[in-house]
Amino acid sequence: MRVISGSAKGTKLKTPDGLLTRPTSDRVKEAVFSIVQFEVQGSRFLDLFGGSGQMAIEALSRGAASAVIVDGRREACKLIGDNLRLTRLSDKAKVVQSDYLSYLGHCREVFDLIFLDPPYAEVFLENALKKISEIDILSDRGIIICERPAEKSLDMAIEGLTRGKDYRYGKTWITLFRKAGTEV
């Protein structure tokens, strides 16, 4: 796992042990940042299921102004901190050890890009989308990027959000959402 582009390009990131974290593949990561390439510079980035921190680190490396990386596990937060130090991006990031719903319940920040890649077997994705819409932390032109397995549907409508395009990369789907009333 490595940083693909930007100031930390080529830096190998530490990966988590065990099966609790499933890092986004380089192929999918590159595709995500190709899709949102014109939105990254100067953005405020939230990774709600941080894992290794690689998606926020990629955003920071490509010019995001700041990032918040949330993960409920102490080991994951330590690993994210290590990866931020490796890439020399610690000063632009905040690592929060918290359950995603607890974090959202107290969040007062607004983000331009929100990345959601929760454990595939859970309903975390749907719950996170609903909560994000309720608390209004997405900027007016912001984008929510959802990663999910090909076999998991995401057919629900979320009040306050407009669903954009779906992109398939092998066994992975990327789905975009924006605030209702904005162009997707």
Functional labels for PLM-detected ranges:
Residues 1-184:
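Class I S-adenosyl-L-methionine-dependent methyltransferase catalytic core
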